[in-house]
């Protein structure tokens, strides 16, 4: 199994269990998330609760709907950004990330990241923002949105911000 960690914070953000599609010459990865139902069933097979003045229900089901990627990697949702805040974040993130890349990859990243950033700005009002479990200030941001008519979210990752770790 391969886990993808945030290059800046070390948080686990994705794994090879979730296939991705490259966008903007590999700058962004697009990953389809799914709503899943999780829960536990409590079955009470004890004495007759009605005779003891208790609850007459013998089975209690606690179900919760979660997005698989958010739940698996314990992503933490962040408040939305306005355009000015988002541009400030993107500039700082690109600067921090570029220092971690090889010179060759830096040039390729800087050439293609502008198109990816423009696309994110164009979807800004539709995006949800997530960070890794540590909530590191300078870590990668994971973006989620719903494609037209979709019931499951689509996630976007900066590919260069991920480090592959074999488990």
Curated annotation (Swiss-Prot):
Keyword line: Calcium, Cytoplasm
Q: Which residues form the TCTP domain?
A: 1-167
Give yes or no: UniProt keyword Calcium.
yes
Q: Which Pfam families match?
A: TCTP (PF00838)
Q: Which GO terms describe its cellular component?
A: cytoplasm
Entry annotated with the keyword Cytoplasm: yes
Which molecular function terms from Gene Ontology are attached?
A: calcium ion binding
The record's subcellular location field reads:
Cytoplasm
**Superkingdom:** Eukaryota
InterPro entries in UniProt: Mss4-like_sf, Mss4/transl-control_tumour, TCTP, Translation_control_tumour_CS, Translational_control_tumour_p
What is its biological role?
A: Involved in calcium binding and microtubule stabilization.
Similarity comment: family membership: Belongs to the TCTP family.
According to UniProt, the name of this protein is: Translationally-controlled tumor protein homolog
Q: Which organism is it from?
A: Pseudotsuga menziesii
- Gene name, per UniProt, is TCTP
């Amino acid at each position: 199994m391969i886990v993808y960690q945030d290059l800046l914070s070390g948080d686990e953000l994705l794994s090879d269990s979730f296939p991705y599609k490259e966008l903007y010459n590999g700058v962004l990865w697009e990953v389809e998330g799914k709503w899943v139902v999780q829960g536990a069933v409590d079955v009470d097979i004890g004495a007759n609760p009605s005779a003891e003045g208790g609850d007459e229900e013998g089975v209690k089901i606690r179900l919760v709907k979660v997005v698989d990627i958010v739940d698996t990697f314990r992503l933490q949702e962040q408040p939305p950004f306005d355009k000015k805040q988002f541009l400030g974040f993107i500039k700082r993130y690109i600067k921090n990330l570029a220092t971690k890349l090889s010179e060759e990859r830096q040039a390729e990243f800087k050439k293609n990241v502008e198109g990816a950033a423009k696309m994110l700005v164009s979807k800004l009002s539709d995006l949800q923002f997530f960070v890794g479990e540590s909530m590191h200030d300078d870590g990668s941001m994971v973006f989620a949105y719903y494609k037209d008519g979709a019931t499951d979210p689509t996630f976007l990752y900066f590919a260069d911000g991920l480090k592959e770790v074999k488990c």
